[in-house]
Amino acid sequence: AAAQTHLSIRRNFLEEAYEACEALDCDDAAMLREELGDVLLQVLFHADIEADRGRMTIDNIADAECRKLIFRHPFLFGGKNASWDELKQQEKGQKTTGEAMQGVARSLPATWRAEKIQKKAAKTGFCWKSAGQALDKLAEEAQELREAVQDDTNIDEELGDLLFAAVRVASTLDKDPEQALHSACEKFIKRFTAMEQSILASGRTLEELSREELLASWDAQKRNGR
């Protein structure tokens, strides 16, 4: 592991974690066993890098995790009743909501990060509480993006605001925005594949059709419930 660095194998860690999640989604025990092993191997790689630096070992990591679990779950280990979030903030030295927001990992998928930040804001009362309010905000942000596109200015900022507002809509509906987007991707792939197969069966290719013909074929698949 000495030839590697945390950054050089960072992508491997992410890929293995996502593959483990894929195994969970598939409810495939054999696949899950393999992928969890791969994740564990990545943990050991990173621990070995730190051991080479003399900063920590896998035993230190396991001990710290046990201590953290005991601290954050006093109702299980000490008979006390306390808020998990409050204990986490106390442990990390976070005194304000802003500090807690800054503590949300930047490496999270953006929809999850936005959701976590919004939930922390919601605990202070700063939020759109109903789906209707959140949808109104989404419409407002959509209009601001439209204006930004017309003016060719601040497009990235307004697009980000629109996506952030969409995450809040999901939260008010108690839905996982990341899962909702994954489902939309799967639906798009399924419908596009059906459209492509239909066009190929007619002896033509997608490239031969006009945009209007492609959209008409897409709408036909949509009406068929695909």
Model-predicted regions and their roles:
Residues 2-35, 41-159, 163-226:
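Flexible "arm" and connector segments at domain edges
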